Amino acid sequence: ETSAAVPETTKAPETTPASSSAVESTDSSVSSGADSYTSLFPTLYADKYDGEYENSENTVYLTFDDGPSVLTENLLYYLRQENVKATFFVVPERTEYCYSLLREISNAGHTIGVHSASHDYEKIYASVDAFLEDFNEAYEIVLEATGKAPDIYRFPGGSVNDYNEKTRDDIITEMDRRGFTYFDWNVDSNDWQGYGWTTLYTNVLKDAEEFSSPVILFHNTGDRDNTVLVIEDIIKALKNKGYKFGSLSQKIKPVQF
């Protein structure tokens, strides 16, 4: 399989990677170790937005992790009915079915960010190298499927979890150096716990009211039927409370743990 060409907006910086300067160090452990990952995946870069953040007051950001899945098209239908754009942090596979769903998400005007290729916490958080390898796989699939290079991502388990304590800071530093921005959330639907319609609806509305810019975590796996069933009513209720809806980008101030 051949990878799609990387668009002009995604490029390595002109500066020499940190790993080359590390060779000059008198400490052999430094020269052979910590920063060697900076030379990995030389096309894995994004143009970092450095302007002012857009006004996100009274704006809801619906985010869906772990898809696409057999429920993606149903979810897209309800979003389309309400004329709402959302953000999908995907766990993509190299299958035509997945590629077609990624294209459908993108063509509908939603934002696609990287979540993970494997969602294997122990594997991806073992080192910065391991994280980059997993991220690059998901990144390339999205790029090949949609022609658009994602520049935002969400850590599996969130940016603070039991698996990334030793590697978290180095991963964030390296991903920031490469131009990528991560988003956590401030409202958790807890749909992963299998809650029914009423509980999801009540919890999301109650928690969303605490923020002027709620970033709501949902999931788009194949067993999250209730998320699909409740989403339209949640959108209508939040609209009635005066909220607008948007999709995440680097122009939105990120919610980070």
Predicted region positions:
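A general structural signal for well-ordered secondary-structure junctions
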Residues: K85, T111, S213-P214, K244
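Active-site beta->alpha N-cap acidic-glycine motif
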Residues: S32-A149, I234, K253
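A general, composition-driven signal for non-globular sequence regions
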Residues: A5-P7, G109, K148, S213
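N-terminal, intrinsically disordered, polar/charged segments of Gram-positive cell-envelope systems
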Residues: E1-E57
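Generic hydrophobic/packing signal
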Residues: A4, T15, Y53, Y61, ...
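Catalytic domains of cell-wall/extracellular-matrix polysaccharide-remodeling enzymes
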Residues: H119-L217, T221-K239, Y243, Q250-F257
